[in-house]
Each structure stands twice: as C-alpha cells, then as structure tokens.
Amino acid sequence: MEKLHFTYQDIHRTAQSIAERVKASDFSPDIIVAIGSGGFIPARILRTFLGKPILAVGVSYYDEHDQPTELPHTVQWIEEAERKLAGKRILLVDEVDDSRTTLEYCIRELLRHRPAEIAVAVLHDKLKEKRGVIPTEVKHYFAGERIEDRWVCYPWDATDIDEHDAARLAESAVPAR
C-alpha cells in the first residue's frame, strides 16, 4: 500500500482548521477526550485553540499475548468517568478514521456515562467503506481532511524525523494522478 506522510506543521494546521470549524458550529465542548495513542497530539493541539481540558482513553486491537483481535477493547479508561463525563459535551479526538471501529467503540463506551453530547474530530478521514458506524447520537463530525485509502505515516511514529519529513517533501513533489 502506498504511504502518505504528514509533518508536524501539517498536523498543526489541520488541527487549527478543525478548531475553527468547531468554534463556528453550534457545538461547544466542555472536555476533549483523546483516543490513545494516535489522538494524543491532535487533542493537545486542539486544546491550544479551544482551551478545554483533555482526558485520555486507551484502546487496543491486541490481546494480552499480542495477538490481533477482531474488535477493539479498553486498555485504559477515565478514572471516575461517571463524575467527569455525565452531562458534559465531549469532543472525541483521534488521528484517523480508517475502519471507524475504534470511534464507534469509544462513542458507545462514552454514551454509557450519560454525556450531554458527543462530537468527533479526526485529522484524516479515509475515503473508503467503514466497518464501524457512528451512532446517531453524534451530531457533529469534524474531519480535517478527507484522504484516499493509503498507509498514513504520522511524525510521532517516526524513528527518524528527518527521513520522515524528506518522504513528505518527495510526495508533495510528485504530480497528482
């Protein structure tokens, strides 16, 4: 599968664009919930623009023996979730909407704690058929960019950031097909 690289500058600009759309909407979050680990940095950048506190959840597709699982499961959840989430407007953040199963899982878990409202923000929404479904309770979905179905390489996953950024530069030099 072809790769698509994003730099920290790309991520920052995309998160800023999302924050502007959140502010222009009728949704005003009380808290940001980051899905770890990909949603941590986007959530932190959104906090800069929205000024809201961040909570984090951990979700995995691997069992205790590092074997892949069909569906996601919780590895870390919000301490005192009922107290922190009930009646709140939550902005759920992840880096990419690929299969949508992680988003669906987290939304359903959050709904158990009776929030006033949940909105979703993702940096990138892959243009492909999704396995998961966003529950109808979610009225706002903010995607920074809609991208083709390629392997996305984020800077926080790079072991050599200069090599990563060079790959991004090379991709931008290739004419669009």
Language model: regions and residue ranges:
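Active-site-facing substrate-recognition patch
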Residues: 1-28
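A structural signal for isolated positions on well-ordered beta-strands in alpha/beta enzyme cores
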Residues: 31, 55, 91, 119-121
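Short, glycine/charge-rich flexible loops or terminal/linker lids adjacent to PRPP-binding catalytic cores
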Residues: 52-90, 100-105
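Glycine-rich phosphate-binding loop signature in dinucleotide/nucleotide-binding domains
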Residues: 24-28, 83-86, 113-114
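PRPP-dependent phosphoribosyltransferase catalytic core
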Residues: 2, 108-177
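Short, structured coil segments at secondary-structure junctions
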Residues: 49-50, 137
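Short glycine-rich phosphate-binding loop at a beta-alpha junction
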Residues: 27-36
